[in-house]
């Protein structure tokens, strides 16, 4: 129990569910909102509730969207023959901001991790396979993180694509090993994307 009561204790616990937020950071945020910016706290709570109510996943690419078909999938100007596979929705944001890529996406919502019980079915590989079978895709661009799990996931997807005769490329290693796309600077990510290689 918090020294200041149950409400503050619940707030501190709730803030700690965010990535990278430990006890001290949660305490700083909570005290700031309660002592200095109550209006900001109300706005944050309202925006979070609205996002939780309205946001879903695009039925085609699985990015976060307010509609069943996101704006990227609905855009007829995008190249339907290229499909970029990423781990998380934030990776799509990073690529869109840093590159001139104009194809489509598929978001895995993670990576293969047998030790954690994350297999192909948990990542929507059946949906990806269906897209590979029906969407007339010429090239699959693998933009998973350059970690052991990301590489294993990329290899699995390359096998799916290559058995269907689809060219498979991997973003270049301008991104440091162990790096996560959302934290890479725009120039490095742009160079890595332009220098992708065949698998």
Curated annotation (Swiss-Prot):
GO BP term (any one):
DNA repair
Q: Where are the zinc fingers (C4-type)?
A: 58-73
Q: Which CDD domains match?
A: TOPRIM_recR
Q: Which family does it belong to?
A: Belongs to the RecR family.
What GO MF annotations does this protein's record show?
DNA binding; zinc ion binding
What gene, per UniProt, encodes this protein?
Answer: recR
Does the entry feature the keyword Zinc, yes or no? yes
Looking up InterPro entries in the UniProt record yields: DNA_Rcmb_RecR, Rcmb_RecR, Rcmb_RecR_Znf, TOPRIM_dom, TOPRIM_RecR
- Return the SUPFAM superfamilies for the record: Recombination protein RecR (SSF111304)
Q: Which organism is it from?
A: Nitrosococcus oceani (strain ATCC 19707 / BCRC 17464 / JCM 30415 / NCIMB 11848 / C-107)
Q: Which UniProt keywords apply?
A: DNA damage, DNA recombination, DNA repair, Metal-binding, Zinc, Zinc-finger
Its name, as the record gives it, is Recombination protein RecR
Q: What does this protein do?
A: May play a role in DNA repair. It seems to be involved in an RecBC-independent recombinational process of DNA repair. It may act with RecF and RecO.
């Amino acid at each position: 129990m918090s020294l200041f009561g149950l409400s503050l204790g619940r707030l501190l616990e709730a803030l700690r569910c965010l990535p990278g937020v430990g006890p001290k950071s949660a305490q700083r945020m909570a005290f700031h909102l309660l002592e200095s910016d109550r209006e900001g706290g109300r706005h944050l709570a309202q925006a979070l509730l609205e996002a939780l109510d309205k946001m879903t996943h695009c039925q085609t690419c699985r990015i976060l969207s307010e509609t069943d078909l996101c704006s990227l999938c609905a855009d007829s100007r995008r190249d339907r023959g290229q499909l970029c596979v990423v781990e998380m929705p934030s990776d799509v944001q990073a690529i869109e901001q840093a590159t001139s890529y104009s194809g489509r996406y598929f978001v895995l919502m993670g990576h293969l991790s047998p030790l954690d019980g994350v297999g192909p079915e948990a990542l929507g590989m059946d949906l990806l396979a269906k897209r590979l079978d029906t969407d007339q895709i010429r090239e699959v661009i693998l933009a998973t993180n350059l970690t052991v799990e990301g590489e294993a996931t990329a290899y699995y997807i390359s096998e799916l694509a290559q058995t269907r005769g689809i060219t498979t490329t991997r973003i270049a290693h301008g991104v440091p090993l162990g790096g996560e796309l959302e934290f890479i600077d725009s120039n490095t990510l742009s160079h890595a994307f332009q220098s992708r290689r065949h698998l």
